[in-house]
């Protein structure tokens, strides 16, 4: 419907009331391969993610894309919720833990490791450049061992 793109954008931006309104008007929350839940997860909008899950989105779509992007962007509560709903933390060759590590999201790394003892990460750290022209953190993963 005409509302499908709008519900994806509202989910991406965390506008739960707008998402609810669009759903009431017939928006397809599963449009474009469940893009709404993926973008809500990527941007840390837990309330939107929960609402979409209740309505029946597939959090495991696109090889567990939702948990991978939530981990990459450091949204621990979203990661925990997705795990509670059956997300696969080892999807795409352990993308979630590897990219959480590379981006300095230690809490997510610790959480994911606590769920699967076969994942071992050593020497994860984040360094900020002292050069004024660099505003983004530079992250380094020196060693990851996944059985």
UniProtKB/Swiss-Prot annotation:
ANK repeats lie at residues 2-31, 32-61, 62-91, 93-121. This is Putative ankyrin repeat protein R847. It comes from Acanthamoeba polyphaga mimivirus. The keyword Iron-sulfur does not apply. SUPFAM superfamilies: Ankyrin repeat. Gene3D superfamilies: Ankyrin repeat-containing domain. Keywords: ANK repeat, Repeat. The keyword Phosphoprotein does not apply. Pfam families: Ank, Ank_2.
């Amino acid at each position: 419907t005409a509302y499908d793109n709008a519900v994806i954008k509202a989910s991406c931006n965390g506008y739960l009331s707008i998402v609810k309104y669009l759903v009431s008007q017939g928006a397809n929350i599963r449009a474009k391969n469940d893009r709404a839940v993926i973008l809500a997860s990527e941007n840390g909008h837990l309330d939107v993610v929960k609402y979409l899950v209740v309505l029946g989105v597939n959090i495991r779509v696109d090889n567990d894309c939702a948990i991978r992007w939530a981990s990459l962007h450091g949204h621990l509560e979203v990661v925990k919720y997705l795990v509670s709903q059956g997300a696969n933390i080892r999807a795409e060759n352990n993308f979630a833990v590897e990219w959480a590590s590379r981006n300095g999201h230690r809490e997510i790394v610790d959480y994911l490791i606590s769920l699967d003892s076969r994942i071992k990460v050593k020497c994860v750290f984040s360094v900020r450049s002292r050069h004024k022209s660099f505003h983004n953190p530079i992250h380094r993963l020196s060693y990851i061992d996944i059985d």
